Amino acid sequence: MPKNLLTLTALALVTTAAAVTVAHERGTLTLDKLARRVVALEYSFVDTLVALGVPPVGATLGTQGGDRGTPPYLQPRVKGVAVTGSRAQPSLETMAALRPDLILADAFVHGDVYPQLSRLAPTAALQSRRGSLDDLNAQTLAIGKLVGRETAARQLLADQKALLNKARVFAKKGAPPFVAAVVTPKSLTVHTSGSFVGSFLEDVGRKNLLPVKGDQTQYEISLEGLLALNPSTLVLFTAPDETPITAAWKTNPLWQRLSAVQRGRVYEFNRDNWTRGRGPLALKLMVAQTIASRFLQDAAPPAEFRY
């Protein structure tokens, strides 16, 4: 066989070996070569890429459209990452200038702009915003494959499983089920067992009172609706720079009738870190806080606990 033909054959074999295919919400995505310039449109993708040692070249870290920006725990880790708008308003122009070879989009948030994104670069639509912990674990593995870090991704998941197993040792057997909710100045939105935080808290050993409602993994309820549920344990995700609606509810007799309030089993965590990070790095912080807050132990949170 001629030397040039041998060289071409070898190159073809290398290219084939480097090709990778993953399933996503729009079908399957095949890359002819591993991604090196990734733009991430959700914080969970950023978290995962950083944990894998391959930070994105760009990410939607902005505050346009009312987004709160990068979660505090991620801020030190994304200083060199270009800002490509916000999750709600990604900048196609800024992304194009970065010449990405892969875009990671949220299946729920970015469905309308998926065609434009896929014209810029190969785009994987993953279930992040409305995903469970299992969905996010599958996401970690898919991202690992796309960037050539599958072994590292599998190790992350193995370490995570071991960490969750250790956390479950602290969980009190027979503890009553909880209701978990994101609280803003205007609303309280419960997170069911199908949401990320709702399923995570079950994975560390407590029982979520609320299953998925139809196709809703999270939905808004009133104080009256919360009292109708009357959970014995209440987990609230709030922001330190906001006054949550529950602050006003605390003067309402209905709030005082809640079993969780009467038992002293109301736990508060930073919603930016807990409900927006949704990646391997965030999970380590979350596990530590479920123990430090005494949530797992079904004991009153210590006065010194601060999220």
Segments from the language model and where they lie:
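Proline-aspartate-enriched helix->loop->beta-strand connector
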Residues: 92-105, 122, 226, 230-235
